[in-house]
Regions:
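Subset of Sec-pathway N-terminal targeting signals
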Residues: 1-39
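Cofactor-binding active-site loop characterized by glycine-rich and histidine/acidic residues
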Residues: 260-437
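Active-site pocket-lining segments that scaffold enzyme catalytic pockets across diverse folds
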Residues: 217, 221-281
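Short acidic (Asp/Glu) and glycine-rich catalytic loops that position anionic groups and cofactors
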Residues: 10-15, 77-80, 136-145, 223-227, ...
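Conserved phosphate/anionic-ligand binding catalytic regions in large, soluble enzymes, centered on
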Residues: 99-116, 246-275, 369-384, 458, ...
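Phosphate/diphosphate-binding loops
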Residues: 141-154, 165, 282-295, 410-414, ...
């Protein structure tokens, strides 16, 4: 244990242990007992208040009298009882503040407005300060420096407002299930710094609007020209195309030369056109019953247009290009997942001999899931389990759940036993980011954080893109029959 085995945010917990040590030294863990036994000077320098009666309890080591009376002890001896009472009140307020701040980090996603259809967030009891026996008025009196190290000269009220904006906006974060505390701390720092949520510049907003217009225009053209033909529209989750654009760009920044995509039928035609670069003519050939030249095809299979695979290249802002492979999709939902993992792993190898090295940054796997399928298909769990195995890991997969809040005709309440479609990933300690599909800039922020995390830890990350389905399951569907 370090000489100071806690940071400022855990000072209230350390103080409570110190109070217990003063009454019963054997009642605290051995490592803490060793720290407290260093003496009042060491504990005072660490920022703790020396409990009354510590010298009389006979616990711990004996301390030399000369030269070690801490400033806090001296102040306590000379202070009036009212001042001592005020100090203890302050200590309790700091404890309440740290608990309330932790509640934002752990449960803020339950107040986030991630549903574009406007459902009320469920909330959580700990997101009300009264749960901890305090109030906003009491907390607002505290300086932020009592709770946050390196805090600016501002009140805790300002910090709490910033935390609410960070954790309870149109992005919700779930990190509390992650086992590695250093990873959790890193994620907190990313969220609270706001680096990934910086507003877009005007030019970037114009390009985002242009991209969304292209996505919508293709869907509307196909809907008009081929009325009633199945295409499994992406409408309601249109933002996934700009999200993939950004994922490609962010991957290239850290050395990626290729991205391997896997997805089911929903939105596949738009991905073929705007991410892989398959021409509109090739897509319309499929609607006309003519085989597209640019797709992966096998003679005699009769595979449908929204199952075709393809490959292409996308130009990046810096003038370079990145190669994109969209794996062919079987009709069995999510079965493509381990195939994409294997393709990515193989492409990461630099050679074929025993000395060949694998570069996880060179090739990135991105999987797009359906909400019902992610929760319900066993192959999803099997693939997630490969994520950290030495023989199989592709160095981190970016998962995007197209969460349109319905599985064919089944509502979430009838299709899964968990609150979120992404909850399966909690068992693997992967970070989860929920985001409102109707907030384009928030969606890009989610991708930005996911790609930075993947580059930092070479680990899987989940984006739960909460949208909706504008039409029926497919465009030939009559909702009054299939969803009465």
């Amino acid at each position: 244990m370090d000489d100071k085995p806690f940071d400022r945010q855990n000072a209230a917990y350390a103080q409570a242990l110190y109070e217990e040590f003063a009454l019963n030294p054997e009642g605290v863990p051995e490592q803490w007992r060793d720290f407290f036994a260093l003496g009042p000077q060491a504990t005072a320098e660490a920022g703790l208040l020396v409990p009354e009666g510590l010298a009389e309890n006979g616990g711990g080591r004996s301390y030399p009298e000369a030269g070690i009376t801490s400033p806090v002890v001296a102040a306590e001896r000379s202070a009036a009882p009212q001042e001592a009472h005020t100090m203890r009140h302050l200590l309790r307020a700091v404890a309440h503040a740290t608990s309330f701040i932790q509640a934002y980090r752990d449960h803020g996603h339950q107040l986030s407005t991630v549903d574009p259809l406007g459902s009320e967030p469920p909330g959580h009891p700990q997101l009300d300060p009264s749960f901890f026996g305090t109030s906003l008025e009491e907390l607002q009196e505290l300086p932020a420096s009592l709770v946050f190290e390196n805090a600016r000269d501002e009140s805790l009220a300002v910090v709490l407002e910033r935390l609410q904006q960070a954790y309870c906006g149109t992005i919700g974060y779930e990190f509390e299930h992650i086992e590695d505390p250093s990873v959790v701390r890193w994620l907190w720092d990313q969220v609270e710094s706001g680096t990934h949520t910086r507003p877009l510049e005007t030019g970037d907003r114009v390009r985002l609007l242009q991209r969304l217009t292209e996505v919508e225009s293709l869907e509307q053209f196909l809907h008009t020209a081929y009325l009633g033909q199945k295409r499994f529209s992406i409408e309601g989750s249109d933002i996934v195309i700009p999200m993939l654009d950004l994922a490609l760009h962010e991957s290239a920044k850290v050395g990626a030369k290729r991205v391997v995509l896997g997805m089911a039928h929903r939105g596949r035609l738009n991905v073929l056109a705007h991410i892989v670069g398959l021409g509109y003519e090739e897509i319309t050939r499929e609607f006309e019953g003519i085989q597209a030249k640019g797709a992966f095809t096998v003679e005699g299979t009769g595979d449908v247009k929204y199952h075709q695979g393809a490959q292409g290249e996308q130009s990046l802002p810096d003038g370079s290009t990145i190669h994109i492979t969209l794996a062919p999709n079987p009709s069995h939902l999510e079965f493509v997942n381990p195939v994409v993992e294997g393709m990515t792993r193989a492409l990461q190898n630099t050679g074929y001999d025993q000395d060949a090295k694998r570069d996880p940054a060179a090739v990135v796997a991105i999987l797009i899931h359906g909400d019902a399928a992610f929760a319900g298909e066993g192959v999803v769990a099997e693939t997630l389990n490969l994520g950290r195995l030495d023989g199989y890991t592709p160095g981190g997969t970016v998962h995007i759940i197209l969460d349109n809040q319905i599985g064919f005709t089944t509502l979430p309440i009838h299709g899964r036993s968990t609150r979120y479609a992404s909850d399966l990933a909690k068992g693997f300690s992967f970070p989860i980011i929920h985001v409102n599909a109707d907030d384009p800039e928030a969606c890009l922020a989610a991708v930005r954080l996911a790609m930075v995390y993947r580059a930092e830890y070479h680990d899987d990350v989940i984006i739960d893109l909460v949208g909706y389905r504008r039409y029926g399951h497919n465009e030939g569907d009559e909702p009054s029959f299939t969803q009465p």
